[in-house]
Amino acid sequence: MNQNLILRIVGVILCIEALCMIPPLLLSVFGGGVDQRAFLYALLICGGVGVLLSLIRADNARLQTRDGFVCVALCWIALSVFGALPYFFSGSCSFIDAIFETVSGLTTTGASIFPSPASLPRGIQFWRALTQWMGGMGILVLMLALLPKLSEGSVNLMKAESPGPISTKLRPRTGETARILYRIYIALTVAEALLLRIAGLPLFDAITTALTTISTGGFSIRDASIAYYQSHLVNWILIFFMFAASVNFTLLYLCVTRRFREALKSEELRVYSLVVVGASAMIATDLIVRTGRDIGSAIENAAFQVTTLISTTGYCTEDFDLWPQFCRCILVLVMFFGGCAGSTAGGVKASRIVLLCKSLRRDLRRVMHSREVRPITLDGHRVTEETVSSVSVFFFAYIAIMLLGTLILSLDNIDFTAAFTASLTAISNVGPGLGAVGPTCNFGFLSGISKLTMSAIMLLGRLEIMPLLVLLMPSVWRRK
């Protein structure tokens, strides 16, 4: 294992995180916030450790696949620990709570321990939003965009951090691909912030909401989330950008370069769009029939909640935990389904669901026709058996971790619905669940063990399980 290079990369990542603490520090200084010292101390500690680690000399600049997984896992753990310092030093919460809030931010989950985000200092509010934006595209991708020559095995870093079963490179060089992804990411963020400002949101609200929408994070500076604004225009703007952020960024790049036909050929996009429209239609119909809602309100709220949960953003325009049981069941299913591979969304991912369904269909055909050889394809390209197998393993691990999390959370003596949806929302990086962890509640009541458990599950979900699990394998740490 290339330990020196891994530690050096961790140091560079911590330096980037320290630089990201400057905007909330300045906001606090010029706004007269009480959290000035918190950010100053956190910046000095994070930056100091980062500089020391980044000075480590690495004779070998090559990262193998194993090194890539270990590096990504250690970087995210370090980011979570040092990113928690502003919360802790500000006196807003305990260190375990600070870890939970930071992990929830970086993994774009959006579950919070704060009962009233609106009462937090401006610096902390902005830090919450910024951590989600940092984690949405991936801070290692940002590092590759800024410092593409830091490691010769940068493709292994990108593979380990990027979501989805099949990785797509937009350019031959990993650094070029990272820069294209971040240009799209920044452009979407700026466009949404401008539209929200035009729609009537205060500038600070527009910026923080844009940061947490494009990252599909869901943190809001308002206690009532998006319901606070009571604006149909804001709701539809958010629906559009939540959907865009949950689509494979490769397809967005094709649209930017006017290759619309190529983008529309995506099987995953067609399935994902069908699920969003279908789930919204079913919920809207049920709301109209069972609750007597008018058609406009039913369609808007159904579309918003389906899009926010399937994209794993986690905003709310109303308490969907009070909706009919059929609606709640559909919302739980879309939380599990998640967005598209190669997006900022969490969940199982539409491409994996498509591959699992095709694998099931092929195996059923083999029962009837044992000699038939039928390869699985996606977008007209043959999918290797190794990829199909990895999707099945991922799905099993996903379910197992979710059930284990439910079991551990039940030790807090909360009901099954709350424990199950809390575990689901953690591994899918959604945010709100049902019952005691519903959209109008927070996670502050959980015990320290449960908060650390959820933090681990959130990291497993964001890194798609394997990078963290490989840390538990003794063979990873043996020198070869």
Listing of model-derived features with the role each one plays in the protein:
Residues 1-480:
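Membrane-proximal intracellular helices of multi-pass ion channels
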